[in-house]
């Protein structure tokens, strides 16, 4: 992808939760380009959430190898790897530990014994970046779903990660909240030079990515740019995925079957 060096590589990775169980992942190989947005897409049971656990060393591969910046992700190195990767989950409530927003964002910095003045400055910086500085003294649980995700992202950004993983982070948001959050994530990628990995079943979300990896039954089904992936509409439908809204409307209205974004569909109309 555009000559970018891979920050994460999966090399013939297989995984099973028990030695006598079926493989959740089977000989999976792919690379995540540094500084770009990769979306890992699949229906429930395709293995996408297992990949997120493997990336940060929560689980270890049964076979094959995972590299982070050429460093093996294994029991010996996983603590070092985790310093560089932040995760935002579907339900951010589980990540909140403080009574107000700014304390939650500061939590990771406190654990790193960051000096107080530096910590306050960093918290204000990242809350401003995610447009939540006006909620700094609010209780996290009083916020909307989209606002909670912004706070969770701020907490990750405070630690200056190289990689931000979004594990079904937009699933519980309404269309406006989802669109707003995805625009923010793209800004984070550009402004902070952070590699984005979104784990999702939602092809509308995947349209924002630079690279899409489609999983099916624990294997890589397709991999490429959005333009490459969405040329294969029938194949995507065959593995249980819903087409993005612009492509659905494109088919419904009888337009040509070329890849189309929201903006492109509006121009056709």
UniProtKB/Swiss-Prot annotation:
Superkingdom, natural source: Bacteria
Swiss-Prot/TrEMBL keywords: ATP-binding, Cell membrane, Membrane, Nucleotide-binding, Translocase, Transport
GO MF term list: ATP binding; ATP hydrolysis activity; ATPase-coupled transmembrane transporter activity
Binding site for ATP: 42-49
Entry EC number(s): 7.-.-.-
UniProt xrefs under InterPro entries: AAA+_ATPase (IPR003593), ABC_transporter-like_ATP-bd (IPR003439), ABC_transporter-like_CS (IPR017871), ABC_transpr_CbiO/EcfA_su (IPR015856), ECF_ABC_transporter_ATP-bd (IPR050095), EcfA_1 (IPR030947), P-loop_NTPase (IPR027417)
Protein's UniProt name: Energy-coupling factor transporter ATP-binding protein EcfA1
Species assigned in the record: Staphylococcus epidermidis (strain ATCC 35984 / DSM 28319 / BCRC 17069 / CCUG 31568 / BM 3577 / RP62A)
Gene of this entry: ecfA1
């Amino acid at each position: 992808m555009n000559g970018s060096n891979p920050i994460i590589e999966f090399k013939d990775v297989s995984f099973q939760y028990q030695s006598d169980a079926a493989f959740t992942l089977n000989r999976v190989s792919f690379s995540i380009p540094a500084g770009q947005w990769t979306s890992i897409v699949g229906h429930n049971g395709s293995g996408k959430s297992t990949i997120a656990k493997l990336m940060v060393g929560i689980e270890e591969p049964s076979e094959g190898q995972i590299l982070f910046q050429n460093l093996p992700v294994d029991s010996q190195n996983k603590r070092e790897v985790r310093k560089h990767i932040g995760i935002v989950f579907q339900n951010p409530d589980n990540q909140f530990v403080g009574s107000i927003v700014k304390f939650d964002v500061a939590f990771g910095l406190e654990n790193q014994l960051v000096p107080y003045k530096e910590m306050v400055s960093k918290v204000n910086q990242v809350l401003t970046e995610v447009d939540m500085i006006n909620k700094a003294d609010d209780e996290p649980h009083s916020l909307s779903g989209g606002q909670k995700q912004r706070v969770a992202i701020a907490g990750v950004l405070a630690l200056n990660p190289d990689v931000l993983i979004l594990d079904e982070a937009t699933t519980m948001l309404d269309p406006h909240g989802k669109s707003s959050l995805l625009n923010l994530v793209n800004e984070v990628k550009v402004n902070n030079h952070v590699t984005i990995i979104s784990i999702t079943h939602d092809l509308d979300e995947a349209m924002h990515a630079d690279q899409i990896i489609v999983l099916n039954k624990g294997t890589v089904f397709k991999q490429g740019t959005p333009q490459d992936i969405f040329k294969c509409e029938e194949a995507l439908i065959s593995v249980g995925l819903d087409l993005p809204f612009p492509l659905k409307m494109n088919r419904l209205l009888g337009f040509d079957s070329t890849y189309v974004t929201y903006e492109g569909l509006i121009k056709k109309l």
